[in-house]
Structure formats: structure tokens, C-alpha cells
């Protein structure tokens, strides 16, 4: 049986309404989330039995794509509609034809690495593979990783 997939690219399509897309017989949808960041609204409305491919890798050479952003995109899409990671993919947002070959390869390596990280078996493993500032509120606030203070028995912190 053929897998029907619809690619939505080039800008925000959320104003067309969810039914425009999800009343159609597609099994999965690829959304450009760089040119169309409001497409997250469509992803949030997508039925949980439909696959979602997050086009979250910026196609321009001048941008740096931290893996944490791609991992967040995968996990957020997985959390919508009870979808789960088995129905989520990561992709470049649009063509990489406008950048040189080595930059395109580097972006594709990053995309593959982010997919590997997003598939971590446990939350602890996921946290270990990411920049601590992305998963630890204290580190995010400080702008650097700092272990939390040790706690003494009875709940009081050591200073």
C-alpha cells in the first residue's frame, strides 16, 4: 500500500485551517517550520494517528542549528495528539541547493545526530546528550552549567 504524504512548505499555512489538511487521506505531513513557524498550530491540531515530519533545519548556510532545537521539535511534535516519537521525523525545512556541498553535508550530519539524540531511551540519557542549559533551569538562568548544591539529610541545603 502506498504511503500518502503531504509537504507543506514556503510559509505559514495555518490560516487555511486544520480541516483543509487533516480531512484529506494523508498518512503523514511534512511542515516547513522555518519559513512557516505558525505551522506549529497545525501540528498541534493534527490527529495523533498521522505522522509529522518537522522541517526544522534552517536551509541557509549562515545559521547554526543547535541539536537541542531539533530535539525539542521532535519531542514537541511527539507530544501532540498522543503521537509518540514513532510517528515523528526531522528534516531540512526546504532545499539545501542554495548552500555549498560541505555546508549541506554538515547540516545533514547535524540532522542525523539530532534524530539519534531525540531517540534516546530514557530522559536521563537524553539530558546527558544535550547541552545542560537546555534541560536544567538553573543552568539556563545562569548561562552556564552549575551543579545544584548538595542537600543535607532533612532537606536543608549546604552552602
What do these predicted ranges mean?
Residues 11-15, 36-38:
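Short acidic loop-to-helix transition motifs that present clustered carboxylates
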Residues 1-9, 52:
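Short beta-strand/loop segments at the ligand-binding rim of alpha/beta enzyme cores
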Residues 116-159:
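Extended, intrinsically disordered, low-complexity segments
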Residues 1, 13-20:
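N-terminal active-site wall of soluble small-molecule enzyme domains
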Residues 20-125:
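Catalytic-face loop-and-helix region of soluble metabolic enzyme cores
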